[in-house]
């Protein structure tokens, strides 16, 4: 029974290519390549980054047990050796009585940047630093996300838009 199951899931074509659930491995590789490929050209990344300010206030907090939180309310979490850092909406942190000391705005760069792209973080972090703005960056699968102090949100957007416009000229 196990062999029949294995043969139905994974077969070998006459060309020697694997077939998984009826899809040729070449198709799967092309699909994954297209899905995985984001932009790597720095000048294109900068001029096309399209920063977007998300609604709401976000905070960084830490918890010992992530299971105590509703994961639908967690924007992201990262397991550190001390505890688990979570980024969540400020309102939810207040409801859960979590302590925080940094209220941030969330800016998403709407270009699909490759995780292998070189220089994008340095470029926008440098532009923000020149304007005296601290940033905390999360590189996710499709986009880069920037957290800046809530009080710096408008100034950060202006700085990012200026960087992008300068790259377009």
Predicted regions and their residues:
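Regulatory modules associated with amino-acid/nitrogen control
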Residues: 32-126, 161, 166-167
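Basic polycationic patches enriched in arginine
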Residues: 17-18
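Structural preference for solvent-exposed beta-strand-turn elements
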Residues: 141-143, 152
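A short linear hydrophobic-aromatic micro-motif
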Residues: 73, 132-137
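Helix N-cap motif at beta-to-alpha junctions
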Residues: 90-93, 149-154
């Amino acid at each position: 029974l196990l062999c029949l199951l294995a043969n139905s899931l994974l077969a070998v074509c006459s060309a020697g290519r694997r077939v998984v659930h009826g899809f040729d491995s070449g198709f799967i590789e092309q699909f994954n390549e297209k899905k995985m490929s984001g932009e790597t050209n720095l000048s294109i990344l900068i001029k096309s980054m399209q920063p977007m300010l998300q609604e709401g206030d976000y905070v960084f907090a830490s918890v010992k047990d992530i299971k105590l939180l509703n994961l639908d309310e967690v924007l992201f979490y990262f397991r550190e050796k001390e505890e688990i850092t979570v980024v969540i909406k400020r309102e939810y942190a207040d409801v859960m009585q979590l302590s925080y000391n940094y209220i941030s705005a969330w800016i998403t760069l709407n270009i699909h940047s490759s995780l292998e792209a070189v220089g994008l973080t340095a470029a926008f972090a440098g532009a923000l630093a020149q304007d005296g703005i601290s940033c905390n960056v999360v590189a996710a699968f499709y986009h880069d996300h920037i957290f800046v102090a809530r009080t710096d949100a408008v100034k950060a957007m202006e700085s990012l838009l200026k960087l992008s416009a300068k790259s377009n000229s």
